[in-house]
Amino acid sequence: MRDSIHKYFQIGTIQWMSHPTYDVIDSIYKLACDDFFDAIEITKFKDDETRDQAKKLLKQSHLKVCYGAQPRLLGPKLNPNDIDEEGRKKAEATLIEAIDEAEYLGAKGIAFLAGKWEKETKDLAYAQLLKTTRNVCDYAAKKGMIVELEVFDYDMDKAALIGPAPYAAKFAADMRMTNDNFGLMVDLSHFPTTYESSKFVIQTLRPYITHFHIGNAVVKEGCEAYGDQHPRFGFENSANDTNELLDFFSVLKEEGFFNAKNPYVLSFEVKPWGDEDPEIILANTKRVVKRAWALLED
Protein backbone atom coordinates (compact mmCIF):
# COMPACT_ATOMS: atom_id res chain seq x y z
CA MET A 1 0.00 0.00 0.00
CA ARG A 2 1.33 3.41 -0.95
CA ASP A 3 -0.86 5.06 1.70
CA SER A 4 0.34 4.97 5.29
CA ILE A 5 -1.29 2.39 7.57
CA HIS A 6 -1.97 5.31 9.92
CA LYS A 7 -4.41 6.74 7.38
CA TYR A 8 -6.76 3.79 7.86
CA PHE A 9 -6.05 2.55 11.40
CA GLN A 10 -5.12 3.97 14.77
CA ILE A 11 -2.16 1.76 15.59
CA GLY A 12 -1.98 0.90 19.26
CA THR A 13 -0.42 -1.49 21.70
CA ILE A 14 -1.54 -3.14 24.91
CA GLN A 15 0.58 -1.54 27.61
CA TRP A 16 0.59 -4.43 30.06
CA MET A 17 1.48 -6.93 27.31
CA SER A 18 4.21 -4.85 25.67
CA HIS A 19 5.93 -3.98 28.96
CA PRO A 20 4.92 -6.65 31.50
CA THR A 21 7.92 -5.99 33.78
CA TYR A 22 8.08 -2.19 33.50
CA ASP A 23 6.81 0.32 35.99
CA VAL A 24 3.46 1.30 34.48
CA ILE A 25 4.21 5.04 34.41
CA ASP A 26 7.60 4.45 32.77
CA SER A 27 5.86 2.23 30.22
CA ILE A 28 3.15 4.77 29.40
CA TYR A 29 5.79 7.50 29.09
CA LYS A 30 7.86 5.38 26.70
CA LEU A 31 4.87 4.50 24.53
CA ALA A 32 3.57 8.08 24.56
CA CYS A 33 6.96 9.24 23.23
CA ASP A 34 6.80 6.76 20.33
CA ASP A 35 4.96 8.40 17.44
CA PHE A 36 4.42 5.04 15.72
CA PHE A 37 1.51 4.63 18.12
CA ASP A 38 -1.79 6.44 17.74
CA ALA A 39 -3.52 4.53 20.56
CA ILE A 40 -2.72 2.82 23.84
CA GLU A 41 -4.64 0.17 25.78
CA ILE A 42 -4.39 0.39 29.55
CA THR A 43 -6.01 -1.42 32.46
CA LYS A 44 -6.71 -1.10 36.20
CA PHE A 45 -4.29 1.04 38.20
CA LYS A 46 -3.13 0.01 41.65
CA ASP A 47 -3.82 3.36 43.35
CA ASP A 48 -5.14 6.89 42.83
CA GLU A 49 -1.68 8.48 42.64
CA THR A 50 -0.52 6.21 39.80
CA ARG A 51 -3.83 6.68 37.98
CA ASP A 52 -3.48 10.47 38.24
CA GLN A 53 0.09 10.33 36.90
CA ALA A 54 -1.08 8.19 33.99
CA LYS A 55 -3.95 10.55 33.23
CA LYS A 56 -1.55 13.50 33.10
CA LEU A 57 0.75 11.74 30.60
CA LEU A 58 -2.12 10.49 28.45
CA LYS A 59 -3.68 13.96 28.31
CA GLN A 60 -0.46 15.35 26.82
CA SER A 61 0.04 12.54 24.31
CA HIS A 62 -2.73 12.84 21.68
CA LEU A 63 -3.05 9.05 21.98
CA LYS A 64 -6.48 7.47 21.75
CA VAL A 65 -6.96 5.83 25.15
CA CYS A 66 -8.56 2.39 25.27
CA TYR A 67 -9.31 0.41 28.42
CA GLY A 68 -8.96 -3.35 28.72
CA ALA A 69 -10.91 -4.83 31.63
CA GLN A 70 -9.69 -8.37 30.86
CA PRO A 71 -7.11 -8.40 33.72
CA ARG A 72 -9.85 -7.37 36.18
CA LEU A 73 -11.58 -10.67 35.37
CA LEU A 74 -8.64 -13.01 34.70
CA GLY A 75 -6.59 -12.08 37.80
CA PRO A 76 -9.28 -12.68 40.46
CA LYS A 77 -10.93 -15.38 38.28
CA LEU A 78 -14.22 -13.52 37.98
CA ASN A 79 -16.69 -14.85 35.44
CA PRO A 80 -19.33 -12.64 33.75
CA ASN A 81 -21.23 -15.78 32.71
CA ASP A 82 -20.98 -17.45 36.12
CA ILE A 83 -24.03 -19.65 36.64
CA ASP A 84 -23.79 -18.76 40.32
CA GLU A 85 -25.60 -15.40 40.49
CA GLU A 86 -23.38 -14.03 43.28
CA GLY A 87 -20.28 -14.78 41.21
CA ARG A 88 -21.85 -13.14 38.16
CA LYS A 89 -22.67 -10.02 40.17
CA LYS A 90 -19.02 -9.72 41.30
CA ALA A 91 -17.87 -9.80 37.69
CA GLU A 92 -20.48 -7.21 36.75
CA ALA A 93 -19.39 -4.97 39.62
CA THR A 94 -15.75 -4.89 38.48
CA LEU A 95 -16.84 -4.10 34.91
CA ILE A 96 -18.96 -1.20 36.19
CA GLU A 97 -15.90 0.02 38.11
CA ALA A 98 -13.89 -0.35 34.90
CA ILE A 99 -16.31 1.98 33.08
CA ASP A 100 -15.75 4.66 35.73
CA GLU A 101 -11.96 4.26 35.67
CA ALA A 102 -11.90 4.27 31.86
CA GLU A 103 -13.98 7.46 31.76
CA TYR A 104 -11.62 9.17 34.21
CA LEU A 105 -8.62 8.26 32.06
CA GLY A 106 -10.23 9.57 28.87
CA ALA A 107 -11.24 6.26 27.29
CA LYS A 108 -14.54 6.03 25.43
CA GLY A 109 -15.28 2.44 26.40
CA ILE A 110 -14.01 -0.83 27.84
CA ALA A 111 -13.22 -4.30 26.53
CA PHE A 112 -13.68 -7.58 28.39
CA LEU A 113 -13.98 -11.31 27.77
CA ALA A 114 -16.40 -14.08 28.57
CA GLY A 115 -15.59 -16.60 31.28
CA LYS A 116 -15.16 -20.35 31.43
CA TRP A 117 -18.12 -22.64 30.79
CA GLU A 118 -19.35 -26.22 31.11
CA LYS A 119 -21.14 -28.10 28.34
CA GLU A 120 -24.08 -29.05 30.59
CA THR A 121 -24.83 -25.44 31.56
CA LYS A 122 -23.81 -23.63 28.35
CA ASP A 123 -27.27 -22.14 27.67
CA LEU A 124 -27.55 -20.84 31.23
CA ALA A 125 -24.04 -19.36 31.00
CA TYR A 126 -25.04 -17.63 27.75
CA ALA A 127 -28.09 -16.10 29.44
CA GLN A 128 -25.92 -14.96 32.36
CA LEU A 129 -23.45 -13.33 29.97
CA LEU A 130 -26.29 -11.50 28.22
CA LYS A 131 -27.50 -10.23 31.59
CA THR A 132 -24.05 -8.97 32.62
CA THR A 133 -23.27 -7.40 29.26
CA ARG A 134 -26.64 -5.66 29.01
CA ASN A 135 -26.28 -4.19 32.49
CA VAL A 136 -22.75 -2.96 31.73
CA CYS A 137 -23.85 -1.55 28.35
CA ASP A 138 -26.78 0.25 29.98
CA TYR A 139 -24.40 1.86 32.49
CA ALA A 140 -21.86 2.77 29.79
CA ALA A 141 -24.57 4.30 27.58
CA LYS A 142 -25.34 6.89 30.26
CA LYS A 143 -21.75 8.12 29.82
CA GLY A 144 -21.75 7.86 26.03
CA MET A 145 -19.34 4.91 26.16
CA ILE A 146 -19.12 1.58 24.36
CA VAL A 147 -18.54 -1.99 25.55
CA GLU A 148 -16.54 -4.50 23.50
CA LEU A 149 -16.34 -8.25 24.00
CA GLU A 150 -13.10 -9.86 22.85
CA VAL A 151 -13.53 -13.18 21.07
CA PHE A 152 -11.33 -15.91 22.61
CA ASP A 153 -10.68 -19.62 22.24
CA TYR A 154 -13.37 -21.90 23.63
CA ASP A 155 -11.41 -25.09 24.38
CA MET A 156 -7.65 -24.51 24.20
CA ASP A 157 -6.40 -22.09 26.85
CA LYS A 158 -8.74 -19.36 28.11
CA ALA A 159 -11.68 -21.65 27.17
CA ALA A 160 -14.07 -18.69 27.15
CA LEU A 161 -17.77 -19.00 26.34
CA ILE A 162 -17.43 -16.66 23.31
CA GLY A 163 -16.04 -17.77 20.39
CA PRO A 164 -15.87 -19.33 17.95
CA ALA A 165 -16.93 -16.69 15.40
CA PRO A 166 -20.46 -18.00 14.61
CA TYR A 167 -21.32 -18.17 18.33
CA ALA A 168 -19.85 -14.67 18.81
CA ALA A 169 -22.06 -13.45 15.94
CA LYS A 170 -25.15 -14.91 17.62
CA PHE A 171 -24.25 -13.23 20.91
CA ALA A 172 -23.53 -9.89 19.23
CA ALA A 173 -26.84 -10.03 17.35
CA ASP A 174 -28.70 -10.70 20.60
CA MET A 175 -26.86 -7.81 22.28
CA ARG A 176 -27.56 -5.37 19.44
CA MET A 177 -31.29 -6.09 19.80
CA THR A 178 -31.15 -4.13 23.05
CA ASN A 179 -27.86 -2.19 23.10
CA ASP A 180 -26.36 -0.29 20.19
CA ASN A 181 -23.19 0.52 22.16
CA PHE A 182 -21.98 -3.10 22.05
CA GLY A 183 -19.30 -4.40 19.69
CA LEU A 184 -16.83 -7.23 19.20
CA MET A 185 -13.04 -7.12 19.35
CA VAL A 186 -11.25 -9.66 17.15
CA ASP A 187 -7.63 -10.72 17.55
CA LEU A 188 -5.52 -12.33 14.81
CA SER A 189 -3.63 -14.26 17.49
CA HIS A 190 -6.87 -15.99 18.52
CA PHE A 191 -7.86 -17.19 15.03
CA PRO A 192 -5.50 -20.21 15.15
CA THR A 193 -6.81 -21.09 18.63
CA THR A 194 -10.39 -21.24 17.31
CA TYR A 195 -9.35 -23.18 14.16
CA GLU A 196 -10.58 -20.34 11.93
CA SER A 197 -9.15 -18.20 9.12
CA SER A 198 -9.04 -14.40 8.92
CA LYS A 199 -11.54 -14.44 6.07
CA PHE A 200 -14.01 -16.64 7.94
CA VAL A 201 -13.84 -14.63 11.18
CA ILE A 202 -14.05 -11.19 9.58
CA GLN A 203 -16.86 -12.13 7.19
CA THR A 204 -18.84 -13.89 9.93
CA LEU A 205 -18.54 -11.02 12.41
CA ARG A 206 -18.42 -8.10 10.00
CA PRO A 207 -21.45 -6.07 11.25
CA TYR A 208 -20.34 -6.25 14.87
CA ILE A 209 -16.56 -5.65 14.80
CA THR A 210 -15.44 -2.40 16.44
CA HIS A 211 -11.77 -3.06 17.34
CA PHE A 212 -8.82 -5.19 16.17
CA HIS A 213 -5.83 -6.85 17.78
CA ILE A 214 -2.92 -8.54 16.01
CA GLY A 215 -0.49 -11.11 17.34
CA ASN A 216 0.67 -14.70 17.21
CA ALA A 217 -0.01 -18.06 18.84
CA VAL A 218 1.48 -21.54 19.09
CA VAL A 219 -1.22 -24.16 18.58
CA LYS A 220 0.96 -27.28 18.28
CA GLU A 221 0.53 -29.26 21.49
CA GLY A 222 3.72 -29.86 23.44
CA CYS A 223 5.53 -26.89 21.87
CA GLU A 224 6.93 -23.94 23.78
CA ALA A 225 4.43 -21.08 24.35
CA TYR A 226 1.45 -23.32 23.46
CA GLY A 227 -1.98 -21.70 23.84
CA ASP A 228 -2.99 -18.06 24.25
CA GLN A 229 0.47 -16.72 25.13
CA HIS A 230 0.90 -14.03 22.43
CA PRO A 231 4.53 -14.71 21.47
CA ARG A 232 6.34 -12.56 18.91
CA PHE A 233 5.79 -12.95 15.19
CA GLY A 234 8.06 -15.67 13.82
CA PHE A 235 8.23 -17.58 17.12
CA GLU A 236 9.22 -21.23 16.69
CA ASN A 237 6.30 -23.53 15.73
CA SER A 238 3.88 -20.59 15.74
CA ALA A 239 0.93 -19.89 13.46
CA ASN A 240 1.34 -16.24 12.41
CA ASP A 241 4.05 -14.25 10.64
CA THR A 242 4.24 -11.71 7.82
CA ASN A 243 2.17 -13.73 5.33
CA GLU A 244 -0.67 -14.30 7.80
CA LEU A 245 -0.72 -10.61 8.73
CA LEU A 246 -0.77 -9.72 5.01
CA ASP A 247 -3.76 -12.04 4.56
CA PHE A 248 -5.48 -10.37 7.53
CA PHE A 249 -4.90 -6.89 6.05
CA SER A 250 -6.16 -8.10 2.65
CA VAL A 251 -9.39 -9.36 4.20
CA LEU A 252 -9.90 -6.11 6.15
CA LYS A 253 -9.45 -4.16 2.91
CA GLU A 254 -11.86 -6.39 0.96
CA GLU A 255 -14.48 -6.22 3.71
CA GLY A 256 -14.45 -2.42 3.92
CA PHE A 257 -12.61 -1.84 7.21
CA PHE A 258 -10.16 0.74 5.81
CA ASN A 259 -11.78 3.91 7.14
CA ALA A 260 -9.75 7.10 6.76
CA LYS A 261 -12.46 9.33 8.28
CA ASN A 262 -13.02 7.24 11.41
CA PRO A 263 -10.19 4.70 11.66
CA TYR A 264 -10.54 1.55 13.73
CA VAL A 265 -8.03 0.86 16.50
CA LEU A 266 -5.62 -1.92 15.56
CA SER A 267 -3.40 -2.85 18.50
CA PHE A 268 -0.42 -5.13 19.06
CA GLU A 269 -1.20 -7.97 21.45
CA VAL A 270 2.33 -9.33 21.61
CA LYS A 271 4.28 -10.24 24.74
CA PRO A 272 7.95 -11.04 25.38
CA TRP A 273 8.42 -14.76 26.05
CA GLY A 274 10.69 -15.72 28.95
CA ASP A 275 13.65 -13.35 29.14
CA GLU A 276 13.07 -11.72 25.75
CA ASP A 277 13.60 -7.96 25.60
CA PRO A 278 10.34 -5.96 25.42
CA GLU A 279 11.81 -3.26 23.16
CA ILE A 280 13.11 -5.78 20.63
CA ILE A 281 9.72 -7.53 20.61
CA LEU A 282 7.94 -4.21 19.95
CA ALA A 283 10.40 -3.47 17.13
CA ASN A 284 9.83 -7.00 15.74
CA THR A 285 6.09 -6.33 15.60
CA LYS A 286 6.54 -2.96 13.90
CA ARG A 287 8.81 -4.56 11.26
CA VAL A 288 6.26 -7.28 10.50
CA VAL A 289 3.44 -4.72 10.29
CA LYS A 290 5.46 -2.48 7.95
CA ARG A 291 6.45 -5.40 5.70
CA ALA A 292 2.94 -6.86 5.50
CA TRP A 293 1.51 -3.41 4.76
CA ALA A 294 4.14 -2.77 2.06
CA LEU A 295 3.17 -6.04 0.36
CA LEU A 296 -0.54 -5.22 0.39
CA GLU A 297 -1.88 -4.39 -3.07
CA ASP A 298 -3.31 -0.88 -3.57
Regions found by a protein language model. Give the residues of each.
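Histidine-acidic metal/acid-base catalytic patches
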Residues: 1-12, 21-30, 36, 106-108, ...
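N-terminal pre-domain/capping segments
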Residues: 1-99, 103, 141, 179-181, ...
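Active-site acidic/histidine proton-transfer and metal-coordination neighborhood
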Residues: 2-3, 81-183
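A cross-domain feature marking catalytic cores of carbohydrate-active enzymes
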Residues: 13-17, 42-44, 67-71, 112-114, ...
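Acidic-and-aromatic substrate-binding clefts and catalytic sites of carbohydrate-active enzymes
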Residues: 17-23, 39-54, 118-120, 155-162, ...
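Low-complexity, flexible helical/coil segments
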Residues: 45-52, 74-84, 97-106, 145-150, ...
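Short amphipathic alpha-helices and their capping/turn segments at secondary-structure boundaries
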Residues: 46-65, 94-104, 130-141, 197-210, ...
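A short small-residue
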Residues: 74-79, 109-116, 228-229, 267-269
